Amino acid sequence: SGTGSEINSWGTVWNNGDKYSISGKDLMPKTVILDANLCKSMPTSLTVSTALDALSHAFEAIWNKNHNPIVDELSIAAIKKIKKYLPLTIKNKSNLKYRKEMQLASFLAGIAMSKTKTAICHSISYPLTSLYGLSHGIACSLTLSEVCKLNVKHNPQRASIISQAMGCTNMNLESSLTKFLMNIKYGSYLKPIKDANINN
């Protein structure tokens, strides 16, 4: 539904193919209006990419060293909404209720991310976008499963918060996330990587 930019002070600029994050108090909005009607015409590819960007925001906020209880609750709510409503939205793109739920999920994850900043998945995403043309949300979510696996091993307590939001345990968090991504046909959005014929 969006990138969460309506509720944070972050932006991106491109310079000769390089992508940079910028931040400033003047980028923070004074008023936010969420109108799901504006999302009804979004194509499936953009719907999926922005939703996975929001999901990445929520995951990264939870395992972020700057996390706090409020961030946790916002992120949990966002994860639950995305898990439930993204598949429904893909099948019923003009359904206003589903669009509203996805927009709210993006908004909540955006607030969480604005308090913690992003983490490794976003950092890795930049070259994936600049070198191979992956859309931002697809690039961010490409490494979610692997980073989840690392967090389960090294910080199981934080990982369990994500697992509970996904309706699973730490033991099957990676497979649960993979199943969710397969359900929304995630592989179909990886064509730029496949075309690049990357072997390692």
Which role does the model predict for each range below?
Residues S1-P69, R158-I161:
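A glycine/threonine-rich phosphate-anchoring loop and its flanking beta-alpha core
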Residues S5-N8, S49, D53, H57, ...:
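Residues on a specific face of well-ordered alpha-helices
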Residues M28, L46-D53, P69-K80, T118, ...:
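Alpha-helix N-cap/helix-start motif at coil-to-helix transitions, marked by capping-box chemistry
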Residues S41-M42, G110-S114, P127-L134:
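A short glycine/serine-rich beta->alpha loop
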Residues H57-N64, K80, K84-L88, F107-L108, ...:
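Short glycine/serine- and small hydrophobic-enriched flexible loop segments
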Residues L74-S125:
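Oxyanion-binding "anion nests"
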Residues S130-I198:
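Gly/Pro-rich interdomain helix-loop hinge
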